[in-house]
Curated annotation (Swiss-Prot):
Record text on subunit structure and interactions: Part of the 50S ribosomal subunit.
Repressor listed as a keyword: no
Function per UniProt: This protein is one of the early assembly proteins of the 50S ribosomal subunit, although it is not seen to bind rRNA by itself. It is important during the early stages of 50S assembly.
Gene expressing this chain: rplM
GO CC, alphabetical: cytosolic large ribosomal subunit
PANTHER family on file: LARGE RIBOSOMAL SUBUNIT PROTEIN UL13M, RIBOSOMAL PROTEIN L13
Similarity field: Belongs to the universal ribosomal protein uL13 family.
Gene Ontology molecular-function annotations: mRNA binding; structural constituent of ribosome
Name listed for the protein in its UniProt record: Large ribosomal subunit protein uL13
Length: 142
């Protein structure tokens, strides 16, 4: 018996809606990363995009446990000497809650060419509304 290798056009893509209300950021991001990669499907192939689309609503209601709101955060470098910047999660969630979820999911995806393709399939919105009703997304409970 030969090993099955999926081709990108033969794996059907589904749309899922996830409500982030009261969900811990890390656990939510881990589940989203699995769905984006397609690891929940029997046709999973590591070098092929077999994942589904994910819509996250109510991004501003995601929670962090413990003291992570002030202690942890998003770190980046401006490429100038002494240009290391740090934004605590408290400030990031106040101003750009959708960015916090995108950063967490991006860190849980493989660091290769497919990561940008996976990230294009992630749609994060503040509030309960989203413009993807035409795709008839399934509600996914996490």
């Amino acid at each position: 018996m030969k090993t099955y290798l999926a081709k990108p056009n033969e794996v059907p893509k589904k749309w899922y809606v996830i409500d982030a209300t009261g969900k811990p950021l890390g656990r939510l991001a881990a589940k989203i990363a699995v769905i984006l990669r397609g690891k929940h499907k029997p046709q999973f192939t590591p070098n092929v995009d077999t994942g589904d689309y994910v819509i996250v609503v109510n991004a501003e209601k995601v929670v962090l446990t413990g003291k992570k709101l002030d202690k942890d955060g998003y770190r980046y470098h401006t490429k100038y000497p002494g240009g290391l910047k740090f934004i605590p999660y408290r400030r990031l969630l106040e101003k750009h809650p959708e960015k916090a979820i995108e950063i967490a999911v991006r860190g849980m995806l493989p660091k290769n060419r497919l990561r940008d393709r996976f990230m294009r399939k992630l749609k994060v919105y503040r509030g309960p509304n989203h413009p993807h009703a035409a795709q008839k997304p399934e509600v996914l409970e996490i």
